[in-house]
């Protein structure tokens, strides 16, 4: 058995793992990152790259008015008592410090996403103007040979243009508002300038991971790809290393030991691609085919920690979002649910929620019950997004430009249905025609008045962010009445699972009795979320992942200094 030795071993190369490794290296600890996949970046690289950390230096430079007290009121209020208040406070108090460290030691550049509100902006302490920041486009050529190892983007943008989160909402208004035209010109100019100057610009999550990788290059931290974590190594009751194997080898291949003199930080994602774990912990219907999380996320870290007695929390939940299960690649729906001229109905042909609500809560409503939990299968799965031709002519849908034809393969699969009448559409989708027609008629009356009397769609600043400001009187309500009609099947997809290892304020793994598993730390989706069952705003996954990776590495360094 081959043996290597470092002070710190980090498992996983997403934002949590990279920040942890960066901190450890800058504190003088020899560090290695091991990654099962052939690319680094994990689900972070596939994401929008948003980071939700109130009162950080990027927001302050932009003059965003906020206070620690307001952020504390907001987060404690929406999370509730399911998460220890000390963990919430640690995140809020240390998150800005973490971000300043990262900005200092990497070429990462961040900017505010103006108007992208907190997901519950009307709650006490919530901000309609938003607290989310995102990475500016990054020239991946700066990575040198490591450019080839960057996790590919989840979705391909037409003409390979580089789009930021704040671009997308304006591009969706291209056919409806002058701001859409201006933003389209700006995005096009950015892309042409990059090509003319020989740059390979990347955006969103890849623009976050790329600079972090350069930070590790400068700090001398190797990132070992195709290196699958198989188990934890324990010596004298302390986690003192990891077993790994080449990802190309059979699972029965003899593992190699990498010793960790000071600690192991698990940052290897959730279990969204582990069918058995999903069936065990999560409510039916559930599958690995609806997630957009990185394919390497199969719960390896959670299972290894559980064998050592680690407590697991919130395993029944995920970073859900209503998703169109397109053949080969599910589509996580955002603006599609907010744009006027659409509704979501269950198999009874009835609405059951505010279609534009935050995506985690929307899937909780799809499942039914408190936080989506209850006996038996989910109550509103599948659901159907119903819209008309005017909606298609005006807005982006599942990556298709306004007016672009629905691909025949989508129609052939039955995931998308099309018909000249609502009754015919109902037949194709398996819905009761009379009920669907009545539901649409009632909704159309709300659209004309501008008031959703049933579910209050369009009343929240979050709803309106992805709405159409030129649509009056409500930017989220539009009549469905211009044939042909379309139906898109909706299922509870996710960005990744939520549940994982219970940790303390320093990211240390805990047992059920509250005792510490010495030498073992966890951050990101391998750990139970500080956000509980909720989601505070754009970047509410990546912000805590980075912060607790930072705190874990600092604790290891501090303990090493005491020895």
From Swiss-Prot:
GO terms for cellular component: cytoplasm; plasma membrane. GO terms for biological process: cholesterol catabolic process; steroid biosynthetic process. Keywords: FAD, Flavoprotein, Lipid degradation, Lipid metabolism, Oxidoreductase, Steroid metabolism, Virulence. FAD binds at residues 7-36. It catalyses: a 3-oxosteroid + A = a 3-oxo-Delta(1)-steroid + AH2; a 3-oxo-Delta(4)-steroid + A = a 3-oxo-Delta(1,4)-steroid + AH2; 3-oxochol-4-en-22-oyl-CoA + NAD(+) = 3-oxochola-1,4-dien-22-oyl-CoA + NADH + H(+). Its EC number is 1.3.99.4. Its cofactor is FAD. Disruption phenotype: Deletion mutant is unable to use cholesterol as a source of carbon and energy, and has a limited ability to multiply in resting human macrophages following infection, reflecting a failure of the mutant to inhibit the TLR2-dependent bactericidal activity of resting macrophages. SUPFAM superfamilies: FAD/NAD(P)-binding domain, Succinate dehydrogenase/fumarate reductase flavoprotein, catalytic domain. It holds the Pfam family FAD_binding_2. Transmembrane segments: none annotated. GO terms for molecular function: 3-oxosteroid 1-dehydrogenase activity. It comes from the Bacteria. Belongs to the FAD-dependent oxidoreductase 2 family. 3-oxosteroid dehydrogenase subfamily. Involved in the degradation of cholesterol. Has a clear preference for 3-ketosteroids with a saturated A-ring, displaying highest activity on 5alpha-AD (5alpha-androstane-3,17-dione) and 5alpha-T (5alpha-testosterone, also known as 17beta-hydroxy-5alpha-androstane-3-one). Is also involved in the formation of 3-keto-1,4-diene-steroid from 3-keto-4-ene-steroid. This is 3-oxosteroid 1-dehydrogenase.
């Amino acid at each position: 058995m081959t043996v290597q030795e470092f002070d710190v071993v980090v498992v996983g190369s997403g934002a949590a793992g990279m920040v942890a490794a960066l901190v450890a290296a800058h504190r003088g600890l020899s560090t290695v990152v091991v990654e099962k996949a052939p690319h680094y970046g994990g689900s972070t690289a596939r994401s929008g790259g948003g980071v939700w950390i109130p009162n950080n230096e990027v927001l302050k430079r932009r003059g965003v008015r906020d206070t620690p007290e307001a952020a504390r009121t907001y987060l404690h209020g929406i999370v509730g008592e399911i998460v220890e208040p000390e963990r919430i406070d640690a995140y809020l108090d240390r998150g800005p410090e973490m971000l300043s460290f990262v900005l200092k030691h990497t070429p990462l550049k961040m900017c505010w996403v103006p108007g992208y509100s907190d997901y519950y902006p009307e709650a006490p302490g919530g901000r309609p103007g938003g607290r989310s920041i995102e990475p500016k486009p990054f020239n991946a050529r700066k990575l040198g040979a490591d450019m080839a190892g960057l996790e590919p983007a989840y979705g391909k943008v037409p003409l390979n243009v580089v789009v930021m989160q704040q671009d997308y909402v304006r591009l969706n208004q291209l056919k409806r508002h002058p701001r859409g035209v201006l933003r389209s010109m700006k995005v096009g100019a950015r892309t042409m300038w990059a090509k003319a100057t020989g740059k390979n610009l990347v955006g969103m999550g890849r623009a976050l991971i790329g600079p972090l990788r350069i930070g590790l290059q400068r700090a001398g931290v190797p990132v070992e790809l195709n290196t699958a974590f198989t188990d934890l190594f324990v010596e004298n009751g302390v986690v003192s290393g990891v077993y790994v194997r080449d990802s190309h080898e059979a699972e029965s291949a003899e593992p190699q030991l990498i010793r960790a003199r000071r600690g192991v930080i698990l940052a290897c994602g959730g279990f969204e691609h582990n069918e058995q774990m999903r069936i065990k912990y999560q409510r039916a219907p559930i599958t690995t085919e609806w997630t957009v999380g990185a394919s390497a996320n199969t719960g390896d870290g959670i299972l290894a920690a559980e064998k050592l007695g680690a407590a697991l929390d919130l395993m029944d939940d995920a970073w859900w979002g209503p998703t169109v299960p397109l053949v080969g690649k599910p589509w996580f729906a955002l603006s599609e649910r907010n744009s006027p001229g659409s509704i979501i109905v269950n198999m009874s042909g009835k609405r059951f929620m505010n279609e534009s609500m935050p995506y985690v809560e929307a899937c909780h409503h799809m499942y039914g019950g408190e936080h989506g939990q209850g006996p038996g299968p989910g109550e509103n799965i599948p659901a159907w997004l119903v819209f008309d031709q005017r909606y298609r002519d005006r807005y982006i849908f599942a990556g298709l430009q306004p007016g672009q034809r629905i691909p025949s393969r989508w129609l052939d699969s039955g995931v998308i249905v099309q018909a000249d009448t609502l009754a015919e559409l109902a037949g194709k989708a398996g819905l009761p025609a009379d009920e669907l027609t009545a539901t649409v008629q009632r909704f159309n009356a709300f659209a004309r008045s501008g008031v959703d009397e049933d579910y209050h769609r369009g009343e929240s600043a979050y709803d309106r962010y992805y709405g159409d400001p030129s649509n009056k009187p409500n930017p989220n309500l539009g009549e469905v009445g211009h044939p042909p009609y379309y139906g898109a099947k909706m299922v509870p997809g996710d960005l990744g699972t939520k549940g994982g290892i219970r940790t303390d304020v320093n990211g240390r793994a805990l047992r059920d009795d509250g005792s510490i598993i010495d030498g073992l730390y966890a951050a990101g989706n391998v750990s139970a979320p500080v956000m509980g069952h909720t989601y505070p705003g754009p970047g509410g996954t990546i912000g805590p992942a980075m912060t607790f990776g930072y705190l874990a590495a600092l604790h290891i360094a501090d303990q090493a200094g005491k020895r």
